[in-house]
Amino acid sequence: MLSTNQKRKVIIDCDPGHDDAIAILLAAGNPNIEIVAITTVAGNAEVEKTSVNALKVCEIAGLHDVPVARGAGQPLFRERLTAPDIHGESGMDGPQLPAPSKQLVEEHAVDLIIRKVLASDGDITLIPVGPLTNIAMAMIREPRIKSKIAEIVIMGGGMFGNTTPAAEFNIYVDAEAAKIVFESGVPITMMGLDLTHQALATPDVIKTLSAVNNKASTFVVELLQFFGKTYLEKFGFPHPPIHDACAVAYCIDPSVVETKRLRVDVETKGELTYGMTLVDLYGVTGREPNVNVALKLDQEKFWDMIKRSLEQLS
């Protein structure tokens, strides 16, 4: 793990989103993470809604000086797809929060990503936990950023799907963008469904987080109660998976997951497989591995990280 004087600089690109909110809080409360910026994208809800939600989470987290920039409102080529059946009409249903006083910066998310990365020493990690539209657009607009991004830690993909039998939501929403990012040559670590479905908020987890007993933990518990209800109704899951926080947890301490370097390609043409991340688990293609694929989660360490971050946000 990094020492506190070696903070990992990150830009969180998100579509809040219940698990996005928890990911932001995890980063905000950890001394080894420096949030350089938060950028928003359409995904779980329209970008207008995800942007407001990001501002609300920043206020709970005390991120008053972190710029929040609104990004792409639709995929590169396809029609927009959102997930009100999981995240509610607001994109973050459940907790009742006042309108945020924090404002978006005027700069577009894509321009902000480009500016921050080019001005850096090559030490910024991108953490996209929604569709990859903003990241792909930044690479298209300014290819020089590719050599200056330290790493991209993606929540998305998997060896099975949750939007179609083949495709996970974040990749399916904008597979063309995902293909650009996965083929960029930038170091990529993928937190797919194989990993995130191990991050289940059980009743014991919720009880532990509730005992923190501050504004941030109360907010998280309310998120989990709503998220748990929709996951049970939609997928039959007894406990909701907290997908996006896995990406932040890895950035805090990579030992929280076990990874394997594998070949991953994004399908953009298939009639039944659009948006699939084809993970060459057994090396049958003979193609060069290009992604660190997370396969196993240290659940105790993961939830302890979240608890500790919430305690710091009191």
Regions found by a protein language model. Give the residues of each.
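Short secondary-structure junction motifs
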Residues: 7, 63-65, 121, 261
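Acidic/polar N-terminal loop/beta-strand segments that form early-domain functional surfaces
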Residues: 40-43, 71-73, 269
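Generic, well-ordered alpha-helical segments
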Residues: 46-50, 84, 105, 240, ...
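A glycine-rich helix N-cap at a beta->alpha junction
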Residues: 57, 61-69
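A residue-level signal for conserved active-site and pocket-lining positions in enzyme catalytic cores
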Residues: 68, 181, 248
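Surface-exposed loop and adjacent secondary-structure segments within mature catalytic domains
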Residues: 69-97
